[in-house]
Amino acid sequence: MARVRAVTVFVSPREWSRESIKRYVEEAAVRANEIAEHIRERIDVWTVRVALPPLPEGVDPIAVASAAFEAAEANGVRYIAAVHLNIGGVGDVKKVIDAIEMGVYGSVLVPRSDQAEKAARLILGISERDLLAATRFALVFGSSWPLTPYFPIAVQTRSGMGFGLAAFYVDDILASLSEYEELDVIRVVANRVFGLIEEVARSASQALGIDYYGADASLSPWMNESVARLIERMMGDAKMGSPGTLAVIRELNRIIRAIASSIDAIGFNEVMLPVAEDSVLKERVGEGRVRVRDLLLYSTVCVAGVDMVVVGEDMGLREVQGLVRDMYAVYKLKGFEVGLRLIRASGRKPGDEIQLGMFGRVPVAWP
């Protein structure tokens, strides 16, 4: 049964003192829980989240992270995206790393390729400090952040307060494949799911007096609710990574974008392939069938980016910097934002596995 993956409340503090941040985050957390309770009358909700805007110049990311995390946790919200910076404003890489390590989510916007080395050092520095912290941080390639409920790059890009939704629905598609042709079932299921989501979201907005920004129609996995499994079904049960994978992802993405055009859509509205969050994709990466370069290729046909990929010691500064440049090239090719969430495990090599908190055992990918 489809369910809401995330109720994300976006809030924009009028000032950035510690007390102001705590007050705004507390209000947003309370509202997020109220929205979730209203929606649960019709459809299950997995998580509630709060997202802040990019930090103004001169604001200390550590102070913001501390205040935001404390206020969110006190109000039952585990997911708080609080530290978003343009890479040009990152004067001290260590401060950003320290802030993310406090438990918040965050991102750095990379609008130009000449900042690739600093961006690579951020990824490597966070991974060296804490592998789980690296799962809470992403680079965003583009001229600005997208407005999406998906973490870690959920950023308030508007004034005031509003909310957006993301959904799980891949299992609904898989369960219905025997009833319809493949492409038809995706349209039928997605239209049904997002019709319901829009209905409950508008009801919550009206009942609670908070703006509904829209839904991100992206097709995303969580472990056995596997997008990679759907891709393989559409390939006639060939393994992901085989010839034909790119074409299937492109077709699937085309359908999702068409669905997004018929709803109040925000965010990416694309196929998402976060390796550590998809049990079938983990298997293919562990087998060496899907490598980092394959994921990079798939992102050219509108996968949201290279996401939740664990790499080993063979990916040092030069290699990560090269991948950053490649992701920037994908952004320029596509013309809209893409993300990179990379976890570098020291002392590990491709084919190894690491334990990564709630994501379980995750394979180290081949470049």
List the model feature ranges, each with a label.
Residues 1-367:
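Anaerobic metallocofactor- and corrinoid-dependent redox/one-carbon enzyme cores
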